[in-house]
């Protein structure tokens, strides 16, 4: 699309103002489907792009995010395309191997921070964290140590303050991470069993 066409049509310019591309992934949510119309004018045909938007442009996946427009607000949650695979994925440290324990438990904190940054809703954060916790426990991590490290991180790290966005105190978060995992076997669905 030439710049003259965009400048002559302010509505068209506005529709593309929040569009972005990272390598082969396009983000054009809430674009009224215009990207599909103009994509061949914007990008060369040799460039194969992934445009993951649903038909109504109110939902898309981009990199590792699900993005939905709900009541005129963007609601994000974590998207991992490996969840869609018809087989189990084995990842993250397995303490039965010859690797240091401290770094392995650090993976839990790093992933929890990533989940908190990506998930707008508390329930999405808890669900992802429970899946990870179960996977790490199956890979010989100690559940009590995981929880203690999480508490220490949330209370002692400036990055742990991100948890404040959910409006729950430490007692509620820990309660949900312990009791929900005991009452809902669905959190084992992504875990590879030995």
List PLM regions with ranges.
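Charged structural interfaces that engage phosphate-rich ligands
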Residues: 1-194
């Amino acid at each position: 699309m030439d710049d003259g066409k965009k400048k002559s049509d302010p509505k068209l310019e506005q529709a593309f103002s929040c569009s972005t591309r990272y390598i082969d992934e396009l983000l054009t949510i809430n674009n009224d489907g215009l990207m599909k119309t103009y994509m061949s004018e914007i990008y060369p045909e040799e460039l194969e792009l992934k445009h993951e938007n649903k038909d109504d442009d109110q939902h898309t996946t981009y990199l590792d995010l699900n993005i939905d427009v709900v009541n005129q607000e963007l609601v994000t949650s974590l998207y991992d395309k490996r969840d869609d695979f018809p087989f189990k994925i084995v990842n993250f440290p397995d303490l039965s191997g010859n690797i240091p324990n401290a770094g392995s438990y650090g993976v839990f904190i790093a992933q929890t921070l990533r989940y908190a940054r990506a998930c707008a809703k508390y329930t999405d954060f808890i669900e992802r964290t429970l899946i990870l916790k179960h996977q790490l426990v199956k890979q010989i991590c100690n559940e009590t140590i995981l929880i203690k490290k999480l508490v220490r991180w949330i209370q002692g790290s400036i990055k742990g303050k991100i948890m404040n966005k959910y409006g729950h105190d430490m007692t509620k978060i820990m309660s949900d991470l312990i009791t929900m995992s005991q009452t809902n076997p669905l959190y084992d669905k992504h875990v590879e069993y030995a």
